[in-house]
């Protein structure tokens, strides 16, 4: 019985190691295949950043919540007036 368990565990470990070794390799630029080159890392990170910025700009125009800037400025003004009011109270 114990011999069959050892064989089963061995087969499972072998199968898992083969599956891991044959898995698809993805590089830093999220492009399949290729080796990871330290010289190209900066370029791939810049490419990802540019893609994220372009996606963010597209979503800002389409997003219904893009009108939050007036709310944010109103909140800042309210906080500033509260801070000024607290400062005046402390002076008295």
From Swiss-Prot:
GO CC, one annotated term: extracellular region
Signal peptide location: 1-23
Top-rank taxon, per record: Eukaryota
One example GO MF annotation: gonadotropin hormone-releasing hormone activity
Keywords recorded for this protein, A-Z: Amidation, Cleavage on pair of basic residues, Hormone, Pyrrolidone carboxylic acid, Secreted, Signal
GO BP terms: luteinizing hormone secretion; positive regulation of luteinizing hormone secretion; regulation of hormone biosynthetic process; regulation of signaling; regulation of testosterone secretion; response to alkaloid; response to serotonin
The protein's name in its UniProt record: Progonadoliberin-1
């Amino acid at each position: 019985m114990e011999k069959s368990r050892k064989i089963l565990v061995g087969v499972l470990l072998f199968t898992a190691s083969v599956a891991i070794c044959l898995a698809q390799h993805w590089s830093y630029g999220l492009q399949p295949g290729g080796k990871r080159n330290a010289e190209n890392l900066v370029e791939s990170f810049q490419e990802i950043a540019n893609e994220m910025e372009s996606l963010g700009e597209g979503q800002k125009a389409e997003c219904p919540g893009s009108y939050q800037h007036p709310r944010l400025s109103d909140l800042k003004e309210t906080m500033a007036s509260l801070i000024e009011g607290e400062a005046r109270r402390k002076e008295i």
